[in-house]
Amino acid sequence: MWNDTQMTEIVIPPVDWRVATQLSIIFGWASVLLVIALFVPRSRTRIVGYLAMVGAMVAAAVGIPLWGVNAETFSGMLRLDSYSLTLNWLFLAAAAITMVLSLDYLPRQGIERSEYYVLVLFATGGMMLLAQGADLIILFLGLELLSIVLYVLTGFAYPRNASEEAGMKYLLIGAFAGGFVVFGIALLYGATGSMNLRAIGETLAQQTLTLEERIYLLAGAALVVVGFGYKVAMAPFHMWAPDVYEGAPTPIAGLLSVGSKAAGFAALLRFLVEALAGEWQIWAPVLAVLAIATLAVGNIGALTQRNVKRMLAYSSIGHAGYILFGVIAAGAPGGIAGQRGVEGVLLYLIAYTFTNLGAFGVLIALEHRGEAAWDMSDLAGLWSRRPWLAVAMAVCMLSLAGVPPTGGFWGKFYVFTAAWLSGMGWITVIGVIVAAIAAFYYLRIVAQMFMAEPAREVPLPMDRALRAGLALATLGVLILGFLPTPAIDLVQRVVLGG
């Protein structure tokens, strides 16, 4: 029997619900919608979509009074600061635009089901966990939640074989990525005795690790980076991206290219800067080589594509290389380079989110004929057939190319400047050269739309929801380009702590 001396009191630490407010709204509302969806007939699926968007907007609005909060809860595992709050807003915006674009797409493709919108909300919650995670366990939980939901959404267009194949490929490769992260976490815990990112960084700064422990730490860190490298489609862990993007439902391909990538970089940046800042001299050159390899693979692959959806997949790989420039700079010792690195990553992700969602939105508008709408020839003479669509696609292509005055220009400018200030001038020069070469395949699409002979087919009219989603994405790109000051002020305040 137990006696009083053997009993230990269990103390539950207080919970700061400000930190978990947005997460609670998203997960709670998604769970409610899952029940509501059971009673909504298939012909009224849009109701669930509208309700899901309301939940995303409420979660975003609730975050406004939380600006300036810098707090942790659940024993330091979950953190809310200006960095994570900004990324949460970005994820919620991406989810809302994705759902708007899906309202017309799903019924046209015959895959309209209520659970689609619920799954998008759960995916958004996974992204937010990756942004707010201050502990390796939370980062892994967010990674797995996001991945599992996206496996389902990628294969959502069953019984279309391409979608099922894409879902299976993503599942198999994602499982390997998760395995790398788990092994990496085990080694990091074995070396430092902690899973908290700041605690790992403090242990490393004290220089009390033995040689064996330091080897375990670096090996564990490498495995975690490999795992997140799969998530952001960083070379040589990019192999899944073209096939998965092509086979996935087009709105989900857009969400994969922006939300999943942004969440992966959010976690990777926090991990490297907080836990491994003391080893910058080791991991920065390695990431620099991987960044150049990612640029090369992505842009060379995109140059050879006639399928616009696959081209955007390779383009997404290439853009991961540019974002890595900012990640490298963010961990650099000294003030200005690190600050500019974080600013560059955030600004690039904001611009890239609106740009890529707009580009995929145009493909959705043309997809009434199935896969043929993804061929370069389907864009021929688009200016004559649908001027508004041609302008939207041109704006997005120019932004992806980094042409001023679009949002993409400011993103590239900041990450290139950050890399230069960090002492990595050689990757900056290579990045500028590659960006100039990459402009060819973006401008090729613009020329196809405005200068080629128009196709004979008469396109179907666009749904109002699709028009609204495209307008939001395109206006976001233009506003970031012509009026960048608010976005720049926002990311600068993030670095300065609000």
Swiss-Prot record:
One of its GO terms (molecular function) is NADH dehydrogenase (ubiquinone) activity. It is a multi-pass membrane protein. It comes from the Bacteria. It is found in: Cell membrane. NDH-1 is composed of 14 different subunits. Subunits NuoA, H, J, K, L, M, N constitute the membrane sector of the complex. Belongs to the complex I subunit 2 family. It catalyses: a quinone + NADH + 5 H(+)(in) = a quinol + NAD(+) + 4 H(+)(out). Keywords: Cell membrane, Membrane, NAD, Quinone, Translocase, Transmembrane, Transmembrane helix, Transport, Ubiquinone. Pfam families: Proton_antipo_M. InterPro entries: NADH-Q_OxRdtase_suN/2, ND/Mrp_TM. Its main location: membrane. Disulfide bonds: none annotated. The gene is nuoN2. NDH-1 shuttles electrons from NADH, via FMN and iron-sulfur (Fe-S) centers, to quinones in the respiratory chain. The immediate electron acceptor for the enzyme in this species is believed to be ubiquinone. Couples the redox reaction to proton translocation (for every two electrons transferred, four hydrogen ions are translocated across the cytoplasmic membrane), and thus conserves the redox energy in a proton gradient. This is NADH-quinone oxidoreductase subunit N 2. One of its GO terms (cellular component) is plasma membrane. Its EC number is 7.1.1.-. The chain crosses the membrane at residues 19-39, 47-67, 83-103, 114-134, 136-156, 171-191, 215-235, 249-269, 282-302, 317-337, 345-365, 389-409, 420-440, 468-488.
